[in-house]
Amino acid sequence: MRIAFFLSVWLVCLGAVAAPNAPATLDRSTWPEQLTSPALFDVASRAEILAFAHALLISEALDENALKQRLGLKAINVDAIDNLRKQMWQRLLSNYNFAQQSCDQDASFCYYVDGMVSLREQAGKFAIADDSFYIAWAEPSREFHQRYLDEQLRKAALFPQISSEIALFGDQESNGDTMNDRLFLLTFDSGPTQSPGTTDWLADYLRKQSIRASFFVLGNSLQMRLDKSGGQAVQALYKDQCVGVQGWEYRSHSHWQAWQDSILRSVALVRQVLPDNYLAQFRPPYGQRREDSGAFFQGQGMQVSLWDIDAQDMAANLGAEESAQRVLSLMLLWRHGVIKFHDTQDKVRTALPWLLKATAQSGLGWEDC
């Protein structure tokens, strides 16, 4: 068993690592079962948790130089990486415990785990037999989890010099960590589009599905839409939805001298046009914001709203269904959280219906904004 584990470490070190601009995704057709019940969702969830835990454990065997090489960085924040790994292990343990609650209905991927030691032990020896019902999923899943883990480790390695959603700066910031099991919140960034556009289609689709999502608008895009369509049309557009801000324009708010003005102008416009929809939250573009911004947001009565699951729908090399499959794989792994799409991307017209159809019988809930 120890030989197999260290062979895995060696193969990871030798293998080509995806570039930071190549988001990880997993072809869900390699999984042999549809998620047609809460128990089958749990089976797939247990498998993804163990596969990711295996990748996480392997990464811990790399020294600092090997990790730099793997992530393609000259310098890394080792403390931030260690903190992220600890958080991931805690969440994996909690998630596996939730996923085990249906083991009496289907025992696939149910192993003895009563704490962190036994979880790490099971992760170390996790493997899919060649004659397994799940063998077609095994290698694509291994590749997905290694690439996804590298995405996250790279963000931690650069934090806080380059801020991102990977960690919180303080109490004025939030993500979906504290949400209940099987509960997810849909969020959409960077709109609105001009009429008629994807924002129109999306808001109408969500209303038909009885889902209230959070839209984080750009002030300049909202102003252009307002100038063209008028206030009543904009109010009709966002009916039954929540509207936060992403700043006046889509740019990093970490080193921009006018970052406060960007937020205040956007908030003023949303509160003027959409007072009943206003959500006192700021979604930083790229997740980049100032480490010392907490006092400002506290003074404005606002929260910085980050995310747990990134659809990566702005990536040119990721198709709409690939984006949806990435989201579903991460929903199985993390079991709750905030999902980020962009309503400026036409991909969401395909990705979101695919996602809702794939999870319709899985016993999931969509958080009300």
Model segments located where?
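Terminal accessory/targeting
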Residues: 2-185, 197, 204-213, 335-369
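Active-site-adjacent pocket scaffolds in enzyme catalytic domains
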Residues: 20-47, 291, 296-334
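Metal-dependent polysaccharide deacetylase catalytic core of the NodB/CE4 family, i.e.
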Residues: 116, 120, 128, 132-136, ...
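Exposed alpha-helical structural elements
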Residues: 144, 232-233, 322, 326
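Short, composition-biased local secondary-structure segments
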Residues: 160-177, 253-271, 325-326
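Short glycine/proline-enriched loop/turn "hinge" motifs that connect secondary-structure elements
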Residues: 176-178, 236-237, 331
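Alpha-helical, coiled-coil/dimerization segments enriched in small aliphatic residues
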Residues: 189-190
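Short, intrinsically disordered/low-complexity patches at protein termini
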Residues: 268-269, 329-330, 363-364
